[in-house]
Structures are given as C-alpha cells and as structure tokens.
Amino acid sequence: MSTEPSEPAGPLAGIRVVALEQSVAGPLASRVLADMGADVVKVEPAQGDFARHWDSYVHGDSSHFVWLNRRKRSVVLGLREPADRAALDRLLAGADVLLFNMAAAAAERAGLTRERLRGEYPSLVVCQVTGYGSTGDARDRKAYDMLLQAETGILGLTGDDRGPVRLGVSLCDIGTGLYAATLILGALFERSRTGEGRFIDLSMFEAMTEFTGPNLTAFANAGVRYGRNRLRHHSIVPYGIFACNDGFLAIAIEHDAEWRVFCERVLDRPDAGADPELSTKRAAAGAPAWTRPGSPMA
C-alpha cells in the first residue's frame, strides 16, 4: 500500500473513499473503486486488517491482503478513542464515499448510524456491509463464506449424492464486494444529478440470493426444486465435465447453432447435428456416450 495517492486517473479520479474494512467483501469493493481512480483511505485498527495475517506468500505479506488492497492509502484509528473519532470525522468531511463492513452493533458504537451520517454529511454516499442485515435477530452474527454458502442454499446445488462440495473460491465475500461496488457507483451517479448522498444497507445474505435467483424463481413459480447436479447444468446440455482417456473435458453448448458446429467440427458427426430429435433432446441422447474413455472423442 502506498503512503501517497497515485496520479489521478480513471473515471473516479477526484473521488475520495474512506473505507473501514476488514477481510474480503469491504476491501474488494473499495479496491474496485481504487482501480477506477478513486483515492481510497483505508482505516484499520491497531492490529491491522485480519487479512494481513492469513499467509505470508508475497515477500512476507499476505497474498489476500496484497490482492485486495492495491492503490490504497492506510491510516490506523481506534474508534473508541475520542481523538481518533474526531480524526475520522475530519476524513468524512472531505470524503465522497464511506464504506464499512462490520457488525451492526459495532457500527452503532462507532457512531456510524444512518441518522447521524445522513444528518451531518448529506452528500456522502454510505455503504454499510453486514452479514445478515442491520436489523433483525441475526444482525450481529458473524458471517463466514462457508456458512453463507450453506444458509443461502448454494451448497444445496453443489456436489452429488455423497453430499455438498464447498466452492473453491470465496464466492460470498467476492460476490458481495462486487455488488457493493456496483451500488456505490449507482449512488455516485445519482448524486451527480441530485447533489444528495445515499445510505446503502447491504447484507451478504441478500447479495447471495442473486446467485440462486433462477432456482428461487423456478421454485416460486413452478414448484421445481433443483438439487445437486454435480458438474452438469440443470437446463442446458451438453454443459459439463466429461471423462476422456487422458483426463476430463469441459464442454458448454448453449443453443442449436453451437450444437451443429460442435457435431461437425469436433465430433466429426454432422449427421448428429442435423438430427432434429437430437437437436431438441440432446441431453439424454449421446453426449455422455460419445465421451466415454476410449471413444474417438477422447
């Protein structure tokens, strides 16, 4: 992390972001803004962002922290100290965006309430990221990627009959961070027309419902309950991982035109591509059979 802001460039040049952030979701959101040219001031506690201590793979620094915090400046503030609270207020007086990801009760103790921020900084765009929302019984629960994958139904769609498989990336953290950045950009655009800021209350739980949207919609409208489908798609075929002689092959065919090209150029089976029955019912037809170990396709 640099001690001075980089040369202004990009669509957000001139925008200052104050980010009270730890872990992944908040830091990723502010890093997206920094990549667009915003001047991001990262506020950390004395012990530093949690992610600083996750590993030491980048010249002694954490790979997660390096990935999430490029192009930012950093300052240490203890928000329980009156002098540091006053320093934060001075930062906010010159800021365009405030981003913070912490439990709702912790935010309230730090004075980061909707009422105060909207009253004292009416043009400030504020984005609060929590695990489960700022109200309700779950508002102060800690949110971890694994738990959210389970609670939002994502793990009900992975794996097979032997059980669920956690996604190999931190989907909930990353997805929420990107969602937060998008909402902040929208609020900045709105402010450019109205002069008014906005308070964005985003939970990781609700952000993850976007990833299960088709499943929720199918169930709500037709009672269809998608289950675990290993590496296949519920509606599109062939779309998955197929076994070959020397390993596995990823195939994704979305529509009939691609199916015809695939049959002609890859399978050397133009007749299959021209077969109307296979064209509409290709899932149950021959794709898995054509990719058995020892087949010509392998």
Across the structure, where does each feature detected by a protein language model lie?
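Short Pro/Gly-enriched beta-strand edge/turn motifs at strand-loop
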Residues: 48-50, 220-226
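N-terminal helix-loop segment corresponding to the beta1-alpha1 unit
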Residues: 1-193
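Aromatic-enriched alpha-helical interface/lid elements that frame and gate functional surfaces
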Residues: 237-298
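Oxidoreductase and adenylate-handling cofactor-binding alpha/beta cores
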Residues: 177-197, 210-222, 263-270, 274
